Swiss-Prot record:
The lineage of its organism: Bacteria, Bacillati, Actinomycetota, Actinomycetes, Mycobacteriales. Binds 1 Mg(2+) ion per subunit. Mg(2+) binds at D72. One of its GO terms (molecular function) is ribonucleoside triphosphate phosphatase activity. The active site is at D72. It catalyses: XTP + H2O = XMP + diphosphate + H(+); dITP + H2O = dIMP + diphosphate + H(+); ITP + H2O = IMP + diphosphate + H(+). Pyrophosphatase that catalyzes the hydrolysis of nucleoside triphosphates to their monophosphate derivatives, with a high preference for the non-canonical purine nucleotides XTP (xanthosine triphosphate), dITP (deoxyinosine triphosphate) and ITP. Seems to function as a house-cleaning enzyme that removes non-canonical purine nucleotides from the nucleotide pool, thus preventing their incorporation into DNA/RNA and avoiding chromosomal lesions. It comes from the Bacteria. This is dITP/XTP pyrophosphatase. InterPro entries: dITP/XTP_pyrophosphatase, ITPase-like_fam, RdgB/HAM1.
Length: 207
């Protein structure tokens, strides 16, 4: 069975392959978006992570005729009513500018005390079949937001985020101070992808 991932991100593709192999589903072939001819990526104009994930998964399934998985993720700060949320990549108005995005959210949270700095990374994955079946799963990585960035690994809001697991262990590292392997083992995307395993397994006898 082939499963299209609506992305060319090697990390996302590899993470799903590893999860499927560990679940005994090594016969499932993970196909990148680059393998699909004449594909026009849809506009992600949804109001929620689920909206955007479904937009991408529906487009992929319709165009390719394959079961398609897509994800949308971002940084959600409780004090900011869950924002930056779906606007995480362009929070400062410049798409993909991590430095200015971080500066803006830090400024917005400047006077917020420690006890009100709860934040989470959120990943929503959608799986859509060519027949129109749709499944939505969500992974959350809970923690808190710092008052200044720390760490050189990762990207996005990683330097501002201390996972709850780090606080529980007494180490207090940001996700930008963790190794990629440590981060992937407990991250929001991994948690979401794990929930797709039984769904994919259920379709493996039909496609």
């Amino acid at each position: 069975m082939k499963v299209l991932v609506a992305s060319n991100n090697a990390k996302k593709l590899g993470e799903l392959r590893t999860i499927l192999e560990n679940a005994g589903l090594s016969s499932v072939e993970v196909v990148p978006l680059s393998a699909i001819d004449a594909y026009d990526e849809p506009v992600e104009d949804g109001r929620t992570f689920a909206d955007n994930a479904l937009i991408k998964a529906r487009a992929g399934a319709h165009h390719s005729g394959l079961i398609t998985i897509a994800d949308d993720s971002g940084f959600a700060v409780e004090e900011l009513n869950g924002m930056p949320g779906v606007l995480s990549a362009r929070w400062s108005g410049q798409h993909g500018n991590d430095a200015t995005n971080n500066e803006l959210v830090l400024a917005q949270m400047k006077h917020v005390p420690e006890e009100r700095r709860h934040a989470a990374f959120v990943s929503v994955c959608a799986l859509v079949t060519p027949d129109g079946d749709e499944h939505i799963v969500e992974g959350r990585w809970e923690g808190r937001m710092l008052t200044a960035p720390r760490g050189a690994n990762g990207f996005g809001y990683d330097p501002l985020f201390v996972p709850a697991e780090e606080d529980a262990a007494g180490t207090g590292r940001t996700s930008a101070e963790m190794s990629p392997a440590e981060k992937n083992a407990i991250s929001h995307r991994g948690k979401a992808l794990q929930q797709l395993v039984p769904i994919i397994a259920g379709y493996s006898t039909f496609f």
